[in-house]
Amino acid sequence: MRSLWVFPQNLFLLLILVLDPNQIWCLDPPRPNFVLMMVDDLGIGDLGCYGNKTLKTPHIDSLASQGVKLTHHIAAAPLCSPSRAAFLTGRYPIRSGVYGTGLTMVFLFNAGSGGLPQSELTFASIAQKQGYETALIGKWHLGLNCENRSDPCHHPNKLGFKYFFGIPLTNLRDCHPGHGTVFQFHIYLPIKTFAVVLISTFILYYFGLLPRVFVIGLSSLAAMVTCFLAAFLLVVPYMNCILMRNGEIVEQPFSTMNLTQRMTQEAVDFMERSAEKPFLLLVNFLQVHTALFTSADFRGSSSHGLYGDAVHEVDWSVGQILQTLDRLGLSGNTVVYLTSDQGAHLEEVSATGERHGGSNGIYKAGKSTNFEGGIRVPGLVRWSEKIPPGLELHKPTSNMDLFPTVVQLSRGQLPQDRVIDGRPLVDLLLGESQSSPHEFLFHYCSARLQAVRWSPQHSDSVWKVFYFTPNFYPVNSSGCYHTHVCFCSPNYVTTHNPPLLYDLSLDPSESRPLGPDTEPDYHHIIETMAQAVRDHRASIKPRDSEMSVGKLLPKPWLQPCCSSITQFCQCQRET
């Protein structure tokens, strides 16, 4: 009898020795699928599961009840491009170069040469090496080409996503007729300045203080500049509003009509054709970023105008994706995650005065700021086979934590040649740890370190210190309504020395800054965080910004074009 057992035992050992380790993963419990969803500019106060009583989000609320709700989930940056770079790489944007310079803090043109460097590793690229089918549906906003149109070095296909259907830039006001332009500050300020100069010039000429030739020359220059700016606004939709399938342009400019339904169907189709393999699907919604749009089925469905209608449509899409997992029998072993790239954009107001930004609930300020309203975002995680339903976790977590979490669960290896700032969430989600994976989180405004968050071990306190804060306008508001977003340059901020200190566990609205007279440990807390800053800065290797003027400005030879210049690059290859 013993000889009968030895043969299969030896055969099993022989198989282990002969087969590639990556080919025998099926001998272990199956690895989970991943469905990761990121809504654009969604405020934490827009969802029923986070306290909203007037918007209907039943599918998202159901997702929250079936898994874990993270109540202290932090975006690594308060703006689209840097936040998404950090999410994909698990690294602060200062490390990858995806940080702003001057008054520009996101990528603005498809024809720029900046983007997420190919040297960066995304969780998708590691999952792909582990045998996962990978796809990105929706918004990218991390660059496209480098040297020419045949060099898509920043394209999602080059950074781990085998399949891509979406927009390489972002949903701009310019992409939807009648919604104005995202370049309003960059263009209207020069126009207003020119108008003041012209009026002053004519007054001086009227009183004989300037010669006529000077007035004629300045007027001609103003006319040329005005014509150039008008032409620029005319071509922006053709330059920037592009829909792609992998490397091919399918619409230029894209139509928002039923676009969410189309992208939802793309997500469903991908899951259906990948159901027999492990897969990673990232759905980056174009909504609820402006220009706001929604299909006819949802128009007028909310009491919050077009913004609320768009939230309803996103919730419907989430429901379709979750129902597909149920239908395919994949819900149990699929990690589902939903978040926003940053807080709601409070300064978004339409030309008619309708509010086009969402709600950040009790949290101060919004998008473009490192106050809680700008970076505290929804964080919902469901893994039905492993995580019990109805949990709430109040410890600080970061959207950077998805990188090491995906790597761990896909049985990949974290890179050893770079700093990874994210921390795996597995132990916290499974109840095997009760502590935040982060003792410190660092909050940048472009390249400037603005704030630090400290979660001491064995304490419920969460301290947050600000070294400078934006100058809000109007003064008593919580936004920068004169510039549409808050900037980081010295002229737009107030420096604090000593720093502002808040205890977020007692003051989540950041309304009561503490000092030595109100916090006995003030000096100890400030010095502890100062030392953390010194240690953190020592780990930063200088890297040029991918948003420098040279990389940011559009270059004709990089402009994607699916027809010809004489046709304004227009095409519609799919209906």
Name each model feature, range by range.
Residues 8-20, 183-236:
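Transmembrane alpha-helices
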Residues 12-14, 24-32, 39, 44, ...:
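Long, internal low-complexity/basic segments
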Residues 23-71, 133, 140, 242, ...:
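Active-site-proximal N-terminal segment of extracellular/periplasmic enzymes that hydrolyze or transfer
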Residues 36-37, 44-135, 144-148, 156, ...:
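Active-site segment of extracytoplasmic enzymes that catalyze sulfate/phosphate-ester chemistry
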Residues 49-51, 69-91, 99-100, 136-149, ...:
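Short, solvent-exposed turn/loop segments enriched in Gly/Ser/Thr/Pro and often Arg
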Residues 55, 147-159, 291-294, 299-310, ...:
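Histidine-centered active-site microenvironments of extracellular/periplasmic hydrolases
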Residues 157, 162-163, 167-190, 344-370, ...:
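C-terminal cap/loop subdomain of S1 sulfatases and analogous C-terminal strand-loop tails that border
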Residues 176-179, 229-250, 267-309, 345, ...:
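Active-site His/acidic residue clusters
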